Every structure is written in C-alpha cells, then in structure tokens.
C-alpha cells in the first residue's frame, strides 16, 4: 500500500459516515485506472469489507476501460453486492505521473489531447463488452468519457 493510503482510508470512512446521517441508500463509485488497485493502493474488497452494507445499493467502477473492468471482474463479483460499470474510450488509462503537467500545458483543456480516443470501441464492440459483463452479473451499465449516444443506444439492447 502507498503512504497515502492512511489518508485515503480516513477520507473514505468520513465519506461513508457522512452519508449515514441521511439514512438513504447509496452507491459507491470507484476508479481504477489500471491494474486491480485503486489509485491509493487498496483493492476494492478492502474498502467494501470495512463498511456496513445495510443501505449499500452496490458498487460501480467508473471511467474504466473495458479491458481493465474485465481484469477486475472476478474480485468485484466476489463481493456479493450489486455491481456495474461506466466504460470509457481513452487510449491511455493511466496518464500518471504527468497528467497535471500535460493538462496544464494543454491548448484546449481537453483530456483527449493527451489521453487519446480509441477508434476501435464502436457501439457494437462496446456492446460485446457490456453483454459479457452483464452475463457475468453486472446490473448497473453505462458509459463514461468518449462514449456517445450511439454507445448508450447499443447498451439499451441488453435486456
């Protein structure tokens, strides 16, 4: 685990504690840019195992490449809670350590300048990934950066 994980744990606990006072169901959104660990170094299961599931609706991996979601599917399924995804279409999924520098030098402020846009993720290709993940148990299905209305329309075919 990275040194920042202690601070990260505190922030996660504070976030989860803060929503308890509302006594409402909640969904956890997490981002894994590459591999199987969160940016702070933890596995998803380490976070989920620390919380009370009473009001938890599920977990969603957001802004994740289809391939990286596939890499994390086994662990997320093992949590025995509803799960899903919001797939992205970037070429680079982990722009660190120079993300901030690249963003600041950007002429347009558009992350596509330094993350790139995948041309292979047509609506049909994204539907193939979404079908695979739905068949594996995903119940929350969506798109994130570089998905288009055509991708979402393709996802709507999953019933």
Predicted feature descriptions by range:
Residues 1-7, 11:
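Single conserved hydrophobic/aromatic residue that forms the stacking wall/gate
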Residues 9, 33, 90, 147-148:
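Conserved beta-strand edge residues that scaffold enzyme active sites
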Residues 9-20:
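Active-site loop-helix segments enriched in His/Asp/Glu that coordinate
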Residues 10, 61-63, 144-145:
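Short, thiol/selenol-centered motifs that function as redox-active sites or metal-ligating centers
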Residues 24-33:
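Acidic, His- and aromatic-enriched active-site or binding-groove loops in soluble protein domains
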Residues 33-47, 51-140, 158:
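Catalytic-face loop-and-helix region of soluble metabolic enzyme cores
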Residues 140, 145-150:
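A short, acidic, flexible beta-alpha connecting loop/helix-capping segment that sits on the rim
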Residues 148-159:
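C-terminal helical cap(s) of enzyme catalytic domains, especially alpha/beta-barrels
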């Amino acid at each position: 685990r990275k040194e920042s994980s202690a601070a990260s744990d505190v922030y996660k606990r504070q976030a989860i504690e803060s929503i308890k006072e509302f006594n409402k169901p909640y969904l956890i959104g997490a981002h894994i840019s590459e591999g199987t660990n969160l940016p702070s170094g933890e596995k998803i299961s380490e976070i989920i195992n620390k919380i009370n599931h009473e009001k938890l609706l599920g977990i969603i991996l957001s802004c994740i490449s289809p391939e990286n979601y596939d890499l994390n599917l086994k662990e997320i399924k093992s949590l025995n809670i509803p799960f899903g995804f919001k797939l992205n279409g970037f070429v680079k999924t982990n722009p660190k350590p120079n993300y901030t520098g690249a963003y600041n030098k950007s002429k347009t402020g558009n992350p596509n300048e330094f993350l790139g846009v995948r041309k292979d993720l047509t609506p049909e290709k994204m539907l193939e990934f979404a079908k695979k993940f739905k068949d594996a148990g995903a119940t929350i299905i969506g798109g994130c950066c570089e998905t288009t209305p055509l991708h979402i329309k393709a996802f709507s075919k999953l019933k």
